[in-house]
Amino acid sequence: MKTFTAKPETVKRDWYVVDASGKTLGRLATELARRLRGKHKAEYTPHVDTGDYIIVLNAEKVAVTGNKRTDKIYYHHTGFVGGIKQATFEEMIARRPERVIEIAVKGMLPKGPLGRAMYRKLKVYAGTEHNHAAQQPQVLDI
């Protein structure tokens, strides 16, 4: 019996919608990364993008445990000398709540072209509205 290898053109990708309100950030991001990679499918192949599309709603209502709301710090660099910037979890949620989930999930995906293709299938929205109704997403309870 030969080993099965999924072909990119034959992979069936479904659309799912997830409500992030009240969910713990790390536990939610772990499951999202797993589904974006396609590890929940029987035809999972490491070098082929077999994952599904995922829409995340209510990103501003995601929860963190302990004192991370005030203690967790996100860093980025502008590229200029002395251009390191930082923001706490609270500031990120106030300014751009979608980025919190995007950063958490992106760090759990593979680095390189395949990981970037998986990351593009993640759609995160701060509120309850999204513009993917035409794809008829199924509700995914995590």
UniProtKB/Swiss-Prot annotation:
Pfam family, one: Ribosomal_L13
Organism superkingdom: Bacteria
InterPro entries: Ribosomal_uL13, Ribosomal_uL13_bac-type, Ribosomal_uL13_CS, Ribosomal_uL13_sf
Family designation: Belongs to the universal ribosomal protein uL13 family.
Organism ancestry: Bacteria, Pseudomonadati, Pseudomonadota, Gammaproteobacteria, Enterobacterales
Function: This protein is one of the early assembly proteins of the 50S ribosomal subunit, although it is not seen to bind rRNA by itself. It is important during the early stages of 50S assembly.
GO molecular-function terms, A-Z: mRNA binding; structural constituent of ribosome
Keywords: Ribonucleoprotein, Ribosomal protein
Cellular-component GO terms for this entry: cytosolic large ribosomal subunit; ribosome
Organism: Yersinia pestis
Protein name from the UniProt record: Large ribosomal subunit protein uL13
Assembly: Part of the 50S ribosomal subunit.
